[in-house]
Amino acid sequence: MTHRSRTQRLAMLAAAAALIAGGVPGSATAFAAPSGAPFAPAPPPVTVLAAVPAADWVRTTDPPSGISAELPGKATVRTATVPIEDQLVDGRAYGEETPDGGIGFAVHDMPGDQYPLEEDLQRFLGSYTQNTAKPLTSHDVRKLTVDGRPALDARPTSQSDGEPVTGSIRLIADDKHLVWAITLGPQANEKALNAMHEQLLAGLRIP
């Protein structure tokens, strides 16, 4: 597998895990392709775009919530509807692929404090593992507050084709939404991944 196809696959799987993780049941695997495409049990391929300078990052807005973030190019959008107790919750993930790894954010239409953020993180790890058959573990987990909202930071790590994988994730509990910001890629690109994640967080806006 080439370096580019590997990072493409990581971005796709991270987006799928973030969306599916919004649901409580471990069997919740409903995943929709971009708008207009038929439903499928697995996410569609991620479009690979060349890396662009930081000055060319594009602000991407989630229309239903108004939540936005800057991403390095035009984002690939994915949607999912996940069962939570007696209701269906809509989620959307906006991701972009770079030569260094995948980056993106996801929004679930549910109160961010409906479940502890630690449980949400565990569902993300479990969803990724379910999709890849490779364990994803979290390190350096810490609670914080972002603009008055509860948040949780962690560093996920795994393996992909024998290569170490690392990244960063932030979960934010808004009154009406659960927000994820994720960066994931080969450990060899850790410095670039950290810089991308910092820029992603700096540009994240929750109305």
Q: What does each of the following model-derived ranges do?
A:
Residues 19, 75, 120-132, 177-207:
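Surface-exposed amphipathic alpha-helical segments
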Residues 70, 76, 80-93, 126-173:
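Signature of long, low-cysteine stretches enriched in small and polar/charged residues
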Residues 82, 108-115, 144, 184-191:
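Second-shell loop/turn segments in exported
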Residues 98-102, 172-178:
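Short, solvent-exposed coil/turn segments at beta-strand boundaries
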